[in-house]
């Protein structure tokens, strides 16, 4: 009787009836992929893109403080007091300034604002100021206020810069005039003055009487004497002469003295700096909207918690670091190995080697079990939470590592300072390249660590179960354990939560192990006997065949003869 089918049936019956618990991890239908240092497009259950690419497309209030749009006035026209910009004179506070690159009202009289780029940079760090009169025009003595058709007010009347006074002769006299401004405000004060350079000596005499006038400006730390430079220059607004406007930031307690006998554009109004802070002067045609943002660029506001952005380098506020990469994905889940549908007797249950499970809820790692009550699955929340905490720490570490003190200054310089602009561009490009490379390398490294961490977590959970069960189960090597005793759902819970009582099931497990080992030994013995019988029969058949073949050969060659006697 062949006993092999009976042995196989017994083994199958043992496997089917055995209770089992498996350690595994989550698998999803996610299509997310990340890059690591060693691999590209690694499937993961979840990831986040660290680079923000969306913006509002508008100017917004920054942290609740509104910006100020200078309207038809340029920065220079506003700061010196172009009479066409009187609507801006009441400006006191802003989060940032917006300047139309093609604003028609700049310096109405031909000339320039000295160190314009530096003054713009200064105002990028000012959040509020107040306009105040420094020296009354009537206190200078026997001179008249000048006006020009180049600087008309809103009514079309000849006027001049509202923050300066252009003194010309009174009658046929222009005496030496002198005044001192003392800064007693307790704050920094912006003081402006200027010089008018006539077309010719004749024009100089007609305006100031003196043919070679001078202007002397002195403080406690420096003094400079200016002479008028006559000559015809390219002009506009009907003027061919030229004005140069200067400025200085006076600290509390400092004083400045002006002395002149012709050509002085004297200070009248200045600005008391009320509050310093980070600001910017943006130049773009986008509109102001009723919105709030944490980060503003010249193309729109950025409201995000992401670590990086690739919208614009010249950003203001609580902004993500600018990098050139359009996408940097950080793995926040596990390596996504699809579940294997055909897993023999245990169906969907499998270990960390074969693949993940699609049924885990509220967890990345967990257990599946099979017993008389059915099949169940449960997440291990503690190990999952630890992994989530580690990933949160990774994200925070990336933010901390990428925080720097570098700020772009590219947007603060006018066309005059082209060499500074070129240098600023090169510095910005170099720094951005470094930031972009560091960011990508950091994310690739963290992705490697994250995926390795998840593999280690599953193996640690597997080892924890193995130590808990000890000799009460057989480790199948694929993440599953065949229990050598009956284990209901309550028993399975104790294995999962670490309260399993090994001694309680030790005797039953010992007997079960002996039974299994006995069946295996008997099976092996029967197999050996069967093999011996088959070997003997096969050898006999071969021997008989050889003898018959020899006899037939001998007879056919005449060497063998049979005599039959009756």
Curated annotation (Swiss-Prot):
For site (Cleavage), what residue positions does UniProt give?
A: 343-344
Arranged from A to Z, the UniProt key words for this protein are:
Clathrin- and caveolin-independent endocytosis of virus by host, Clathrin-mediated endocytosis of virus by host, Disulfide bond, Fusion of virus membrane with host endosomal membrane, Fusion of virus membrane with host membrane, Glycoprotein, Hemagglutinin, Host cell membrane, Host membrane, Host-virus interaction, Lipoprotein, Membrane, Palmitate, Signal, Transmembrane, Transmembrane helix, Viral attachment to host cell, Viral envelope protein, Viral penetration into host cytoplasm, Virion, Virus endocytosis by host, Virus entry into host cell
So which stretches are on the Extracellular side? 19-532
Signal peptide residues on this chain, from the entry's feature table: 1-18
* Iron-sulfur listed as a keyword: no
> Membrane topology per the record?
Single-pass type I membrane protein
Query: One MF term in GO for this entry?
Result: host cell surface receptor binding
Q: Where is the lipid attached (S-palmitoyl cysteine)?
A: 555, 565
Q: Name one Pfam family in it.
A: Hemagglutinin
Subunit field text: Homotrimer of disulfide-linked HA1-HA2.
Q: What is this protein called?
A: Hemagglutinin
Organism, scientific name: Influenza A virus (strain A/Whale/Maine/328/1984 H13N2)
């Amino acid at each position: 009787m062949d006993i092999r089918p009976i042995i196989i049936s017994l083994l199958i019956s043992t496997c089917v009836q055995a209770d089992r618990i498996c350690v595994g991890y989550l698998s999803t239908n996610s299509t997310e992929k990340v890059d690591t240092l060693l691999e590209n497009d690694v499937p993961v259950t979840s990831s986040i893109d660290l680079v923000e690419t969306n913006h509002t497309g508008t100017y917004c209030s920054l942290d609740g403080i509104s910006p100020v749009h200078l309207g038809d006035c340029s920065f220079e026209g506003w700061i010196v007091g172009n009479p066409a910009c009187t609507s801006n004179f009441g400006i006191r506070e802003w989060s940032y300034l917006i300047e139309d690159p093609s604003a028609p009202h700049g310096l109405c009289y031909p000339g320039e604002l000295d160190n314009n780029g530096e003054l713009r940079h200064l105002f990028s760090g000012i959040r509020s100021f107040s306009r105040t009169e420094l020296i009354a025009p009537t206190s200078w003595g026997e001179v008249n206020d000048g006006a020009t058709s180049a600087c008309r007010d809103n009514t079309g009347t000849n006027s001049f810069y509202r923050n300066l006074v252009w003194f010309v002769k009174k009658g046929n006299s222009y005496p030496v005039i002198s005044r001192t401004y003392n800064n007693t405000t307790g704050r920094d004060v912006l003081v402006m003055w200027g010089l008018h350079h006539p077309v010719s000596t004749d024009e100089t005499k007609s305006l100031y009487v003196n043919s070679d006038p001078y202007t002397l400006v002195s403080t406690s730390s420096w003094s400079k004497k200016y002479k008028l430079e006559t000559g015809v220059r390219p002009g506009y607004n009907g003027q061919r002469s030229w004005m140069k406007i200067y400025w200085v930031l006076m600290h509390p307690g400092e004083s400045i003295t002006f002395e002149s006998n012709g050509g002085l554009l004297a200070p009248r109004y200045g600005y008391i700096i009320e509050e310093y802070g980070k600001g910017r002067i943006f130049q773009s045609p986008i509109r102001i909207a009723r919105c709030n943002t944490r980060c503003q660029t010249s193309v729109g506001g950025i409201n995000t918690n992401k670590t990086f952005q690739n919208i614009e380098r010249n950003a203001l506020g609580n902004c993500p670091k600018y990098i050139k990469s359009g996408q940097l994905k950080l793995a926040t889940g596990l390596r996504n190995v699809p579940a294997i549908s055909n897993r023999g007797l245990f169906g969907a249950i499998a270990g960390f080697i074969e693949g993940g499970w699609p049924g885990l809820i509220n967890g990345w790692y967990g257990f599946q079990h099979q017993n008389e009550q059915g099949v169940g699955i449960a997440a291990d929340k503690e190990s999952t939470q630890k992994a989530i905490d580690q990933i949160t720490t990774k994200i925070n570490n990336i933010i901390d590592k990428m925080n720097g003190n570098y700020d772009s200054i590219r947007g603060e310089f006018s066309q005059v300072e082209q060499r500074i602009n070129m240098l600023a561009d090169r510095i910005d490009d170099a720094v951005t390249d470094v930031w972009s490379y560091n960011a990508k390398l950091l994310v690739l490294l963290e992705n490697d660590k994250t995926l390795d961490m998840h593999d280690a977590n599953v193996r640690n959970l597997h080892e924890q179960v193995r130590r808990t069960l000890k000799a009460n189960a057989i480790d199948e090597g694929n993440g599953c354990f065949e229990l050598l005793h009956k284990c209901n759902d309550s028993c399975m819970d104790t294995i999962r939560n670490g309260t399993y009582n090994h001694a309680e099931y030790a005797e039953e497990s010992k007997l079960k192990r002996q039974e299994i080992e006995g069946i295996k030994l008997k099976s092996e013995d029967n197999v050996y006997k069967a093999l011996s019988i088959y070997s003997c029969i096969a050898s006999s058949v071969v021997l008989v065949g050889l003898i018959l073949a020899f006899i037939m050969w001998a007879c056919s060659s005449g060497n063998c003869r049979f005599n039959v006697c009756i």
